[in-house]
């Protein structure tokens, strides 16, 4: 929660410490009323390697690649969420529910990858590669299919740690095969060939998603 609450659009904007917290309390209470176990996250990071003084990166970046106004990126990942990061933590403590600091988890991921490699996680599309967006896209907020899988895996690991009752339901795979590009490989044979020699005596688990191979 938090990305869209930051928008100044009156239909989506909420105030951290006020209406944003109230919404989180409502979500927790309604979930509990249905017998569910609520887990609150804070926002994942934006891929923002630009100084906070540059307002251009505080919005969803969907500029055409190569635009002359594109700011110069550095090597330090900067926060864009501010007080919105603390609301889920505060409400979780107040109501006694599990909290996952997805901001820190994704910050460590994106900062560790750096400004170049981290583009692989987000909707960075080269011009003339996708018919729907021939001009390409440089979106530093929304994850692509691969990035979503990477972050989802980290989220599941964190949930299992914070809510031990769910840990037994988590399934771990060494490789994932998927036709839509959401896995590590497109074919089963590629995944088999990727198993290193030193794992020959160790079980390697490969998840094969639905499809014809």
Over which residues does each language-model region extend?
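Extracellular beta-strand scaffolds
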Residues: 183, 212-213
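Residues within well-ordered beta-strands of beta-sheet-rich folds
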Residues: 37, 207-209
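Acidic Gly/Asp/Thr-rich repetitive segments characteristic of extracellular carbohydrate-active
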Residues: 175-207
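Alpha-helical cap/lid subdomain in secreted, periplasmic
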Residues: 1-145, 149, 153-164
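Low-complexity, Pro/Thr/Ser/Gly/Ala-rich linker/spacer regions in secreted
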Residues: 167-174
């Amino acid at each position: 929660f938090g990305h869209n609450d930051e928008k100044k659009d009156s239909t989506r904007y909420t105030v951290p410490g006020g209406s944003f917290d109230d919404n989180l309390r409502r979500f927790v209470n309604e979930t509990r009323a249905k017998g569910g176990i609520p887990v609150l996250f804070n926002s994942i990071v934006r891929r923002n390697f630009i100084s906070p003084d540059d307002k251009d990166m505080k919005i969803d970046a969907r500029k055409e690649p190569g635009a002359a106004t594109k700011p110069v990126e550095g090597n330090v990942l900067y926060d864009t969420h501010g007080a919105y990061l603390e609301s889920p933590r505060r409400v979780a403590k107040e109501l006694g529910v599990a909290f996952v600091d997805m901001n820190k988890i994704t910050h460590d991921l994106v900062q560790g990858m750096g400004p170049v490699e981290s583009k692989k996680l987000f909707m960075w599309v080269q011009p003339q590669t996708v018919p729907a967006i021939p001009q390409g896209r440089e979106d530093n907020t929304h994850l692509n299919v691969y990035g979503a899988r990477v972050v989802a895996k980290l989220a599941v690991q964190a949930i299992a740690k914070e809510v031990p009752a769910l840990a037994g339901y988590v399934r771990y795979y060494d490789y994932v095969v998927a036709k839509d590009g959401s896995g590590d490989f497109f074919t089963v044979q590629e995944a088999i060939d990727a198993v290193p020699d030193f794992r020959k005596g160790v079980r390697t688990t490969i998840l094969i998603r639905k499809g014809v191979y």
